[in-house]
Amino acid sequence: MPITKDEIIKALEEMKLNELNELVKAIEDHFGVVASVGVAAAAPAEATNAAPTEVSVVMTSVGQQKVAVIKVVKELTGVGLMDAKKIVDGTMPVTIKEHVKPEEAEEMKAKLVEAGASIDLK
């Protein structure tokens, strides 16, 4: 009767680290393969260097033109005047909008900065 996967795994669990290392080397030699972690690990690193597909528009300070900033926040978020005022009067930093395309976020940032606010894109 052939050995099952579960039996192999159980045997591996009982082995010491140096024994596992020797086993990997023996498998590499026997089958002519290389167990390389570096190749598999390189792919996610490339993905993290890609430009983000969504960002958040975060206001770090209101500036001197509070009324102008409230109007822009109202326009950008679609909330009422009182809700926009609550957002602007809230504790900084405050997220104005999440999950925004980078191009749209840049436009929003430009409008808010023009109104006097300080903005970060995260």
Swiss-Prot record:
Alphabetical keyword list: Ribonucleoprotein, Ribosomal protein
SUPFAM superfamilies per the UniProt record, alphabetical: ClpS-like, Ribosomal protein L7/12, oligomerisation (N-terminal) domain
Keyword match Mitochondrion: no
GO BP annotation list: translation
GO cellular component: cytosolic large ribosomal subunit
Cited Pfam families: Ribosomal_L12 (PF00542), Ribosomal_L12_N (PF16320)
UniProt cross-references to PANTHER family, sorted A to Z: 39S RIBOSOMAL PROTEIN L12 (PTHR45987), LARGE RIBOSOMAL SUBUNIT PROTEIN BL12M (PTHR45987:SF4)
Quaternary structure and partners: Homodimer. Part of the ribosomal stalk of the 50S ribosomal subunit. Forms a multimeric L10(L12)X complex, where L10 forms an elongated spine to which 2 to 4 L12 dimers bind in a sequential fashion. Binds GTP-bound translation factors.
Similarity annotation: Belongs to the bacterial ribosomal protein bL12 family.
Name assigned to this protein: Large ribosomal subunit protein bL12
Species for this entry: Mycoplasma mycoides subsp. mycoides SC (strain CCUG 32753 / NCTC 10114 / PG1)
